[in-house]
From Swiss-Prot:
Plant lipoxygenase may be involved in a number of diverse aspects of plant physiology including growth and development, pest resistance, and senescence or responses to wounding. It comes from the Eukaryota. Residues 1-61 form a transit peptide. It catalyses: (9Z,12Z)-octadecadienoate + O2 = (13S)-hydroperoxy-(9Z,11E)-octadecadienoate; (9Z,12Z,15Z)-octadecatrienoate + O2 = (13S)-hydroperoxy-(9Z,11E,15Z)-octadecatrienoate. It comes from Oryza sativa subsp. japonica (Rice). It is found in: Plastid, Chloroplast. This is Lipoxygenase 7, chloroplastic. Its EC number is 1.13.11.12.
Amino acid sequence: MLRPQLNPSSHTTTTSSSSSTQLFASSSCIASLRRPSSSSSSVVAAARRTRGQGSSRVVVVCASSSATASRGDSSSDMAAAAAVRVKAVATIKVTVGELINRSIDIRDLIGRSLSLELVSSELDAKTGKEKATVRSYAHNVDDDDHSVVTYEADFDVPSGFGPIGAIIVTNELRQEMFLEDINLTASDGAGNSTVLPIRCNSWVQPKSVGDEGTPSKRIFFANKTYLPGQTPAGLRSYRKNDLQQKRGDGTGEREADDRVYDYDVYNDLGNPDSNGDLARPVLGGNKQFPYPRRCRTGRPPSKKDPKSETRKGNVYVPRDEEFSPEKEDYFLRKTVGSVLQAAVPAAQSLLLDKLKWNLPFPSFFVIDKLFEDGVELPGVDKLNFLESVVPRLLEHLRDTPAEKILRFETPANIQKDKFAWLRDEEFARETLAGINPYAIELVREFPLKSKLDPAVYGPAESAITADLLEEQMRRVMTVEEAISQKRLFMLDFHDLFLPYVHKIRSLDHTTMYGSRTVFFLTDDGTLQLLAIELTRPASPSQPQWRQVFTPSTDATMSWLWRMAKAHVRAHDAGHHELITHWLRTHCAVEPYIIAANRQLSEMHPIYQLLRPHFRYTMRINARARSALISAGGIIERSFSPQKYSMELSSVAYDKLWRFDTEALPADLVRRGMAEEDPTAEHGLKLAIEDYPFANDGLLIWDAIKTWVQAYVARFYPDADSVAGDEELQAFWTEVRTKGHGDKKDAPWWPKLDSPESLAHTLTTIVWVAAAHHAAVNFGQYDFGGYFPNRPSIARTVMPVEEPVDGAAMERFLDNPDQALRECFPSQVQATVVMAVLDVLSSHSTDEEYLGGEQTRPWNSDAAVQAAYDGFAARLKEIEGVIDGRNKDRKLKNRCGAGILPYQLMKPFSDSGVTGMGIPNSTSI
């Protein structure tokens, strides 16, 4: 394994006597454009691609072979010299056709469309204030690359100006522009030139719309990292003011072109003004429903419920958090295509059934037709119901040419084995190598006991007995022996769901149980499904009911067993979507993004480390609040908890979420799936050796940890440097006290008091945003696209639930196949969820992957670059390791006849639904 070592004490700096070089002396990105002599090794030139939203441009980046650490001040007194000529080349991304080119009107003809001002890193020695900026207007120049527009400006920088530390940009056009980068080139008149690259990758608003949220001037700092205390004197106020602009003042409604980051509670999921049934409780800021915070929009309160926010218009996110044009186009095309596929059986269902959402599939043959033959698309006029399913798409459906035959892609697991969903072995295997590998846990005591109040919910002790389990284990050992040997495992959805059973059952066309599912680890390393317990708590009108189901050769019990598995799969689907996926990788991450942008300057090394791992997350979360998790949205219409779905995620946040166990090793230990062992690989001994998610995930965790440790060591040599970083401490304080304010006093929050604690905290954030999310997101269509394998909802109770409904029991005995299909999601529910999973599981064409070249750090410090090279190389190695494991027939949980290889932790992928690839961020 590559483990690049960084030496934070290295302070060698490339110097030059020319004034052009000294203009850029504050940057570690000094690049001599002269051809170096064969004996020179102090400057190493490298070409790399700038990180842009969907484009690539090659710029020259040069770094000292023993570069200055950001703590050091590499500036020097500027020798007396004549004014230096500096050329600026600004690259602007063309976003919609040739829109920017067409907008170059009279302002551009007279050369006043883009104002640039050079900012010195030094203060004026006489006044003690910032030096006057050097200003010039940029003019449009021809460029062979039609994806960008290039502007150039010339400056005569006076002697004594000092190193250039930043550039101020004013957009004098009538519309916003996406500024990719600015490259400054200084010449000394003797043929010597130096280059200072400045990363921008940001939307710059027109001067005409400037206000508190969208300032008319934007500052972009040179690609040089500084801890707050080492900021050059001439840049300190700029650094402070830029952060203040991003914080805003907490008032007013945010506009689409703002760049303000602030917090609010989840009070925008309901829509009480539209319909009283769509009112939802506020999540966050109260003891009943604690929750992370979201981005504040400032929309006015609801008329009927002042605590709720109105749901008008597009949900605000800061302008730089929006999708790139490429991402937006891909997302729209993917969504439209998927919804068209879902629309066919859904529209047919609505035409045939006045109950609309509740018509089951008439046969498994019809389900198969979705993938095999396709179905004919009805007219668009029959699809108006989609306005209530996936808002804002109907107009695109009208404009999209449709094929006469539409067909869902066959999910990968069904391609491998059409009947895998029926097998107990596959049910068990997917707890280790499916899309919710975070739910299974070790059985550590027996009998199984609930922590709920028995006076309310019934006896705490489970109905699963030792004798029953031992019978299913064929008496090879006792339960006591199995527990001591760590061979019993379970899915425990009992205490989480039981308090909501009667609430959910009061709703139409859904049901709920508390459930426990027990597995036995066999000698060949696979799991055997032993028993399922389903529980209905007591109510004022009925006593508690519970029953344990086991595999059976009896026809009736065999079908009851299949129905019990369908209920557990629906429980697992809800747990996965609401908790493992939404809560832990989307919702809990948004506060990190808000706090980082409010408290960490863009020249802060930790901001530069984290920024790639926040890409698109806020926009995706905002869209989820609009259509996915909102009242009457797809989750509520299609998953068992329905209107109580988000309440349940709040309960899970209260009872289960803690930052310290979001780290993969700690999560495995918490669930009993591993124990600490310094002699074992990764320092952990797994309870199940062939646990594909854990085995591959730990490789990724260690690679991230090694990279982050190296990066942190470059900037923080000791505990004092961490504790003394005021921006870093403010960031972490705000995460705890504001972003996760309902848990601010929890004792488990780590303290950032050493390089080690900082590296571990950052590794956890990167892991959750990248690898955790990839593990639970990009396999959703492969495992859930064929919904009998993973139904999102169970709609009918078990036929044997007491008091037994005689008519329902007769129908079950007469046609158990139909009874199972009636328990499954309806045609509308199933196909809409299939369409959504297809979108969620897909990589866009502009995806940026963990360790990819597009997200290489902009700080061109040679040691940082070497560490990143090692990180990228290690991830390539891991791909090979995973491929090898998937071909190893001894690993039966990932290799075998009809078994889908486990590839969700493979770092890289092509676009589309691939079942692999780890994007840098919580992205779809």
